[in-house]
Amino acid sequence: IVFQMEPYIERNPKQWHDWTNPDNKEFVKVCKHREGEYNNNEWHLSKTYSQFNNESIVKTKTFSTVLSSNYRDPGHVKRIDFVKFLESKGLPIHVYGNNRWDYKEYKGSLPYHCKDEGIIPYKYTFNAENHDIPYYYTEKLTDGILGECLTFYWGCPNIRELIDPRAYVQLDLSNFEKDYEVVKKAIEEDWHTQRLPYIREQKKRILNDLQFFPRLEKIISNFIENHTL
């Protein structure tokens, strides 16, 4: 079974070699974005499956983002520029990660794959994928949903087909003023409370259906069912 999890693999054969375009006939299944297969859902939070299912989450803070310092890919540029724009508008946003860009409310770096402090206490969080590719979405969205945040999100253009749009707010990031007004309105009107039931529903879907192990089980079961003599 092959899961292609990186963007634009087909454009970089020198890096991926035989894995650029593996033959479907040689594997139980090959999951490619360009053939309508989504990324396995993962998370960069420290909590386990059991903890997500059994522990209550209490919100004590308002709005955050967790960013790297990268400023290369389209999404890198959009997310850093948008955070700086929000700061210029006077909208408070706590920034975690790298402070190369001198954020007004920088709160510090976080341990690798452990974004808990920057997500779980917050009602709202913002992030953007590195690229806007159909079926390609990552922890940039799932971390917020698992942490029961209302996530302001840019990236996968057909994300509405994959995750209930009531569980996040999709931004365009081609008109920062318009997106700022959406963010401001959402916080002022407490969309988090309004949408929390949908966020929790999608949290269950991620844990029980969309993440690696449930998906793997379905693929194997389907293969066995269709190849039983």
Predicted regions mapped to residue ranges:
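Pol beta-like nucleotidyltransferase catalytic core
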Residues: 1-128, 132-229
